[in-house]
Amino acid sequence: MTADDQLAVADLHSHLVPGVDDGARTLEETLDGVERMTQAGIRKIITTPHVDASLTREPAAFSERMDEMDDAWARALEAVTERFPDVDFRRGQEVMLDVPDPNLADERLRLGGSSFVLLEWPRLQLPPGTVDVLVRLRRAGTRPIVAHPERYVGFDHGLELVTEWRRVGAYLQLNYGSLVGRYGVEARTLAWRLLGRGWIDYLATDFHGRPHLKLFWREAVQKLEEAAGEEQISLLSVTNPQRVFRDEEPLPVPPLLGKRTLWTRLREFLNLEQN
């Protein structure tokens, strides 16, 4: 791996396979989306079209859906490789857990040929039994990454559920846009709380490849820099996502404590004086 590769921003969550979900509709939008990501400094991309886990219960329907995905992916990969030869462009899936007992053995459901799988639950609502599902997936040999937990409606204000997810070996992926209010105040607040606990393992764009949509990468990085989060940026945007490409577990991310306020510095000074 070259020095440039080691510093390359990597993204694990986007929708750039043309015409298969609510992301890029055409090959032109795929190429435009990749170009916009490279302009933001992203050089490693695992794009993740939606697929419902319930399809794995119906072999014929699953095969038809994956054949459709494979054909569109082949066209996208050829075009991206030709136009952006320096981009490491791979495919996974964002798996919708619409059943409690999914079979995710098919390697195409994993992120870029790794053992990691990107997961979400339907309609941004959490059903009962999410911990049990994650345990079963872990026992089956997959490494679950929960996509954008901050976006779930009324989600886990006490963070007890996140604690359980992490205890059973799940990882968490936060959207850049959440840090700047893209999904509302509640999602933004929870996003920063999770960073403050050190419980986020990856940042990703969740970019849907449409011309009117933004990446929010630069805006989010600026906010993190303002919060003294340079180490977190490096781990969440570069180091840990790159480790997925090598099928390696993420490194621990320290809690984001933010800049010390004037009041905090004053209290520290007074305590020193008293001591």
Question: What residues fall within each predicted segment?
Answer:
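Short acidic/histidine-rich active-site segments
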Residues: 50, 197-215
